[in-house]
Amino acid sequence: MARYEFFRQIFIVLSIVSPLVRSFTVITSDSTAPSALIDGPQTGFTMTNDGARTEPDEQDAVYDIMRATGNDWAAAIPDVCRGRWHGIECMPDQDNVYHVVSLSFGALSDDTAFPTCDPQRSYVSESLTRLKHLKALFFYRCLGRAPQRIPAFLGRLGSSLQTLVLRENGFLGPIPDELGNLTNLKVLDLHKNHLNGSIPLSFNRFSGLRSLDLSGNRLTGSIPGFVLPALSVLDLNQNLLTGPVPPTLTSCGSLIKIDLSRNRVTGPIPESINRLNQLVLLDLSYNRLSGPFPSSLQGLNSLQALMLKGNTKFSTTIPENAFKGLKNLMILVLSNTNIQGSIPKSLTRLNSLRVLHLEGNNLTGEIPLEFRDVKHLSELRLNDNSLTGPVPFERDTVWRMRRKLRLYNNAGLCVNRDSDLDDAFGSKSGSTVRLCDAETSRPAPSGTVQHLSREEDGALPDGATDVSSTSKSLGFSYLSAFFLVFPNFIFMLISS
């Protein structure tokens, strides 16, 4: 029921937000608009005054931009701001002259009518620099079959630009330093291109930047020492970045999400990370982190998801009080991190915890008896460790979690004969847990009960996905409902 209650609350939030935010469209408040512009952005406009018109040079620029994307039909529109086609937003000035403030290209979803791009011949037109009032520019899956570099002239779009989204366009080469000239940028999204080279140091000029997504590229070098006080979202996952997590990152006190997963980041997690008291998601999975388990994590009292999977150089124990202050933690993924020692009893006192993955480590000792009374967990993975002793779970816990309770490949685990768990463990398992010897509390030489973990043919159960990427894990489904729409949700935040 807790799972359905969580999704119910998410859908309530989305039902409130969705009328206010169109996919990949920024509605800027009057307070941030240039003084020469009045009212709000409009997709087309009603002619209440026959003198209303689009600024002629901007109209010609839009024609050029549309032709560059294969949309030659736009030249037949007598006035681009009153053409009533999605993908363009305009705003009037005090002389009733309309200016283009937003352009969007690419099919975001089945119900989005933004102009598509001709994949064979589309390119980014330099006429964009003639749109002096442009606040938002979106290109989504427009240029994949005609790979090219990000044009340096985009850095001349001026101080009005607040949102630049160039997702999945197959851009090659380095990120141009000139983008750092867009000093009023709030959202920069270059997700899933083929960019290489280092992250430009000029990005430190983005004093008002709130969301930076460079994920899914081939960027190299170290993570710059960003000091961006307004930054809420930092997503650099799936690159080739090296070096440590920069300590200056903790100066970005507005961070809600940090995803540095699937890079080659080394060294310890900075102790100063406890300054990020608004952080909700921290994903450092599949890097080369080392050092002791950071005690400073307990200061992240807003944290809801912590993923450190696949950092095999940790080789450390988990301190008993490591998660003391994480009262909001819902998802904890520490799989395959070479963690040693026993399972901390304090994990059972995290009352918000729903998903716990500790599989593939070197954990020893018994599963703490305190897990017997844990009612809030919906997914627990302890498989592939060296745990011993009786399984402490109550019958209803085993039934409730079913295949999401994984204990296989712990040769020392056993089930007490009087525990009434024999039929609670499913028959489709692929591994077994033996009955306990009454005298030693260790597995008896004979007699087994099946344990639910994976199907008999070795495949994962129906509906499950192997956690080859932490962000796709079953457990992460709780937060994915929020963060899958987060790129749109953040646009609402920056407009408030």
UniProtKB/Swiss-Prot annotation:
InterPro entries: At_inactive_RLKs (IPR050994), Leu-rich_rpt (IPR001611), Leu-rich_rpt_typical-subtyp (IPR003591), LRR_dom_sf (IPR032675). In epidermal cells of developing shoots and leaves, but not in roots. Expressed in the stomatal cell lineage in the developing epidermis. Accumulates strongly in meristemoid mother cells (MMC) and meristemoids, somewhat less in meristemoid sister cells (stomatal-lineage ground cells, SLGC), and is barely detected in pavement cells. It is a single-pass type I membrane protein. Residues 438-464 are annotated as: Disordered. It is found in: Cell membrane. Glycans are attached at N181, N196, N362. GO terms for molecular function: peptide binding; receptor serine/threonine kinase binding. It comes from the Eukaryota. LRR repeats lie at residues 158-182, 183-208, 210-228, 229-252, 254-276, 277-300, 302-325, 326-350, 351-373, 375-401. One of its GO terms (cellular component) is membrane. Keywords: Cell membrane, Glycoprotein, Immunity, Innate immunity, Leucine-rich repeat, Membrane, Plant defense, Repeat, Signal, Transmembrane, Transmembrane helix. GO terms for biological process: asymmetric cell division; cellular response to abscisic acid stimulus; defense response to fungus; innate immune response; regulation of antifungal innate immune response; response to abscisic acid; stomatal complex formation; stomatal complex patterning. Residues 24-473 are extracellular. The chain crosses the membrane at residues 474-494. Pfam families: LRR_1, LRR_8. Disruption phenotype: Lack of stomata in stem, hypocotyl and on the adaxial side of the sepal. By contrast, cotyledons, anthers and abaxial side of the sepal have excess stomata, with many in direct contact and producing clusters. Altered responses to abscisic acid (ABA). Enhanced susceptibility to the necrotrophic fungus Plectosphaerella cucumerina BMM (PcBMM). Disulfide bonds: none annotated. Residues 495-496 are cytoplasmic. Induction: Up-regulated by SPCH-SCRM module. Promotes cell fate progression in stomatal development. In leaves, needed to correctly orient spacing divisions, to limit the number of asymmetric divisions in neighbor cells, and to promote the asymmetric (amplifying) divisions of meristemoids. In stems, promotes the conversion of meristemoids into guard mother cells (GMC). Positively regulates CAPRICE (CPC) expression in differentiating stomaless-forming cell files. Forms constitutive complexes with ERECTA and ERL1 involved in the recognition of the stomatal regulatory peptides EPF1, EPF2 and EPFL9/STOMAGEN. Belongs to the RLP family. PANTHER family: OS05G0588300 PROTEIN, RECEPTOR PROTEIN KINASE-LIKE PROTEIN ZAR1. Forms heterodimer with ERECTA or ERL1 through their extracellular domains. Not able to form homodimer. Interacts with EPF2 but not with EPF1. Interacts with SERK1, SERK2, SERK3/BAK1 and SERK4. Interacts with EPFL9/STOMAGEN. TMM lacks an intracellular kinase domain and may participate in active signal transduction only through physical interaction with other proteins. Overexpression of TMM leads to altered formation of trichomes. This is Protein TOO MANY MOUTHS. It comes from Arabidopsis thaliana. The lineage of its organism: Eukaryota, Viridiplantae, Streptophyta, Embryophyta, Tracheophyta.
